[in-house]
From Swiss-Prot:
Any one GO cellular component localisation term in the record: small ribosomal subunit
GO biological process: translation
HAMAP family noted in UniProt: Ribosomal_bS20
Origin species: Aeromonas hydrophila subsp. hydrophila (strain ATCC 7966 / DSM 30187 / BCRC 13018 / CCUG 14551 / JCM 1027 / KCTC 2358 / NCIMB 9240 / NCTC 8049)
Matches recorded under Pfam families: Ribosomal_S20p
Protein name per its UniProtKB record: Small ribosomal subunit protein bS20
Region (Disordered): 1-27
Keyword Ribosomal protein attached: yes
Stated role: Binds directly to 16S ribosomal RNA.
Keywords, sorted A to Z: Ribonucleoprotein, Ribosomal protein, RNA-binding, rRNA-binding
Any one GO molecular-function label of the UniProt entry: small ribosomal subunit rRNA binding
InterPro entries in UniProt: Ribosomal_bS20, Ribosomal_bS20_sf
Family membership noted in the UniProt record: Belongs to the bacterial ribosomal protein bS20 family.
Amino acid sequence: MANIKSAKKRALQSEKRRQHNASRRSMTRTYLKKVIAAIASGDKAAATAAFAVAQPIMDRMATKGLIHKNKAARHKSRLSAQIKAMA
């Protein structure tokens, strides 16, 4: 454990930030799973609706630095391609 006052403060801030990021990451994964489940069920309307909700969340997480912007772009691109491939 830290002995210096500033190090103690940084440790507290780091833990608080870690918990906040964990909840955001969990939320992002949940929305992605909803899109994937809708694609798997074959319901294009539901998949499109779920993707419309998940897309800005992915962008926001990339902007905040929670995930890399290329990872967000990759997820969006692949999900969009899967939805377009549905007949």
